[in-house]
Amino acid sequence: MPRPLKMSYGDQKPPYSYISLTAMAIIHSPQRLLPLSEIYRFIMDQFPFYRKNTQKWQNSLRHNLSFNDCFIKVPRNVTKAGKGSYWTLHPMAFDMFENGSLLRRRKRFRVKQLEKDISNWKLAAAANTEMVTHYLDDQLTQMAFADPARHGHVLANASAAQMSPYKATPPILPTTVTQLPARPKRAFTIESLMAPDPASTPNEGLVPMEYGSPDAVALEKPPFNLPFNFNELAAQYQLYFPSFFYNGQYGNIPCYQKTPPLFHNGPLPVF
């Protein structure tokens, strides 16, 4: 984590970049995300230099927020009062400052467009269910397990979330399988083809079979082989995007079950 702040600059300009000032405000917030107005307030409260000429430096800071991948825009929950979105640090950017010093930053943090789209989609879904803080904690915990030496200092302030794979509810299988009656054979003539079928009772010709019998298994097999297996596809998707599956520990919350489906054919929304 960043070192304690030095508050003795007085009216002098502190030696921090706008990226460092913004990261400083976000890191010191309880939920690690703030609206733009709160970021401004934190900077002015800590550094008197920024209490004057506010329009100039606020425009520059807002420009840095929009054009740096280390910051993520989180939509505001519709149930909360106020306007404007929240801002937070990308989960992989919490350690972008060398040795925890906000004065020294590593090379510019960049994120691939696909990863950015997926992250925006997840944060939008988390904002609708008020789970943004849990999402950030889970991302930090996964990073620490992947590289404990590098991300050990981040775990100090990240709650240890229990990760559990996505589990689908097994379908309810029927106890019996009913075989449909075969249509009676008839001569290949116009009169025969246009004639109605002979009357029969609703259950006549239906042969009940026990589930699991050879005849029932033969009826359950599709007439062709599918080009892929859905479970295998889901396993491969989880391999390349492990954090795309939500944690099962929040699955019992009613509002949490209203999130968009995990798999869809349309493009990922960009916020």
From Swiss-Prot:
It comes from the Eukaryota. The keyword Transcription regulation applies. Residues 12-103 bind DNA. PROSITE patterns: FORK_HEAD_1, FORK_HEAD_2, FORK_HEAD_3. Pfam families: Forkhead. Keywords: Developmental protein, DNA-binding, Nucleus, Transcription, Transcription regulation. GO terms for molecular function: DNA-binding transcription factor activity, RNA polymerase II-specific; RNA polymerase II cis-regulatory region sequence-specific DNA binding. GO terms for biological process: anatomical structure morphogenesis; cell differentiation; regulation of transcription by RNA polymerase II. SUPFAM superfamilies: Winged helix' DNA-binding domain. GO terms for cellular component: nucleus. Expressed in early embryogenesis in 14 symmetrical pairs of segmentally arranged neuroblasts and in developing peripheral nervous system. Also, later in embryogenesis, in a cluster of cells in head region. It is found in: Nucleus. Its main location: nucleus. SMART domains: FH. InterPro entries: Fork_head_dom (IPR001766), FOX_domain-containing (IPR050211), TF_fork_head_CS_1 (IPR018122), TF_fork_head_CS_2 (IPR030456), WH-like_DNA-bd_sf (IPR036388), WH_DNA-bd_sf (IPR036390). Involved in development during embryogenesis. This is Fork head domain-containing protein FD5. It comes from Drosophila melanogaster (Fruit fly).
